[in-house]
From Swiss-Prot:
It comes from Rotavirus A (strain RVA/Human/Indonesia/69M/1980/G8P4[10]). Residues 208-313 are annotated as: Interaction with host EIF4G1. It comes from the Viruses. It is found in: Host cytoplasm. This is Non-structural protein 3.
Amino acid sequence: MLKMESTQQMVSSIINSSFEAAVVAATSTLELMGIQYDYNEVYTRVKSKFDLVMDDSGVKNNLMGKAATIDQALNGKFSSSIRNRNWMTDSKTDARLDEDVNKLRLLLSSKGIDQKMRVLNACFNVKRIPGKSSSVIRCTRLMKEKIERGEVEVDDAFVEEKMEVDTIDWKSRYEQLEKRFESLKQRVNEKYNNWVIKARKDNENMYSLQNVISQQQAHINELQIYNNKLERDLQSKIGSVISSIEWYLRSMELSDDIKSDIEQQLNSIDQINPVNAYDDFESILRNLISDYDRMFIMFKGLLQQSNYIYTYE
C-alpha cells in the first residue's frame, strides 16, 4: 500500500530518469554527427539547462503539486484535494491538457521567455487608443484573481528608488559628463600630438639614414670604378711585360728549345687575374734562378777539372 510521499518520490524518479535520457540523447546525437565531446562538460551543461527549464517553466512544480495532492488523498486527507475537483473529473483529458501545457512552458523557457515575462503577459495587455500615441494598460482576469487572493504586493523600495531617479540633477550630471569628455578629448589630443612628433622624428631619422646609405653607395660605386680601372691597368701592364720579355727573348743567342720553353711559361701567365699573374711570374723567376744555379754548378765543376780557379769581381 502506498503511503506518505510515495507518489512524489515516483514523480521525482521520473524527472531524474528524464534528465538521464536527455544526457544519453545528447551524447548519442554528438556521436552520430562525428563531433568529439567531453562527457562531463555535456553532463554539466545539460543538467544546468534541464534544471533551469524545468524550474522556470513550472513543469516540475506542477507535477510535484499533483503528486502531493494524490499523496494527501491516499493518506485520507480528501478535503485538501477538493480545490482540484474541476480537473479530476476526466483524467485522460487532464493528462492531455497537462502535457500540452508542459510542452508550451518548456518551449517558452528554452526560447528565453522566462517565468516573469509569462506571468506579466498573462496579467496585463495593452489597448491602443486610435489617433493617439499613448495606450491603455488593462488587467486580465488572472490579475483580478491574484488581487483577490492577495498575491499582489507593492514594492515600496522600488517606488522610493523611482522617486530618487526622477529628482536627478541632470544639469550637474551633464556638466560632469562634459568635463569628462573635455578631459578625455585633451588626453586624446596630447597622445595624438606626441604620436605626430614621434612620427616626424622617425621620418627624419629614416631620411637621414637613406642619405647616409646613398652616400655610402656612391662611395662604393666610385671605389668599384677605381678598382675596375686599376685592374684594367694591371692587365695591360702584365700584357706589356710579357710582350717585352718575348721580344727580348727572341734577340738572345739561345737555342730554340730554351726559347720555346721560356715562351710556353710566359704564355701560361694569367693576364686576366693580376693575383694569379704575380704567382705565375714568381714561378718563372724561381725556375730561371734554379736553371742559373745548375749552370753555375756545372761551370764550376768544369773549372775545377781543368785546374782553374774562379773569383767574383
